[in-house]
Each structure stands twice: as C-alpha cells, then as structure tokens.
Amino acid sequence: MPGRARSSEPGFREAYREWLDRVNPIIARHQYGRGGPVILYNAENEYQVNTDAAYMQDIQDRARAAGIDVPITTNDCCDAGSWSSTWATGPGAVQIPGVDDYPQSFACDTPGEWGP
C-alpha cells in the first residue's frame, strides 16, 4: 500500500478511510445511547511515534460523520510525553486522553517473566 502507515499520506488515507467507512456505521448502531454496549470510540492506540494531527482529526471527523457521538479517546504507552500531552488541544485532540502501562516490566514476548 502506498503512503506511510498511520499518517494522512494519500495512499494510506484511502485505505483507512475505506475501512472506517465500513466499520463506523456498525459501531454507530451499537452505541450505548442506542441500546448497545459501545461507550467510547478509540481513535488510535499507542500513537506516540507519529503525531500527524490531520490523520487523527480525519479519523474523528469520519466517526462523527457516521453518527458516532460517544466520547473519542486514545491511549499512549507509558505516559511517554506523547499524544496526550503534546496534542492536548487543537486539531486531532481527543476528548479523553488515556495512558497504558505494563505492570512490573511485563513484556508480551516473555509472559512468564515479571520484574520487581
């Protein structure tokens, strides 16, 4: 696929828009206010390596255009001073920024090993 992944570059934008345009109407039908279980819309996940505000804003705009009206969120890994702090306001900012972290140095590739 042409274009840098997780960006607003045209090749990738065409691909993610096609996907969102099929998935978002399904999510919209299943929102909490319409009798479904969906209470949040996670626009991205651990997006601290790229900070393309146009990409994040486009994802949110497409969600709203599809009728998604629950709060929009995203989460950053390890509170790395990334999306939630860098983009707290302005284009691409989400309503509920979140942070995730892995307890006790847990690594998915070594699930039997835990740090102190």
Annotate each predicted stretch with a short phrase.
Residues M1-I59, A63-D69:
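Active-site mouth of glycoside hydrolases
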Residues E46-D69, D76-G115:
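Substrate-binding cleft/loops of secretory-pathway carbohydrate-active enzymes
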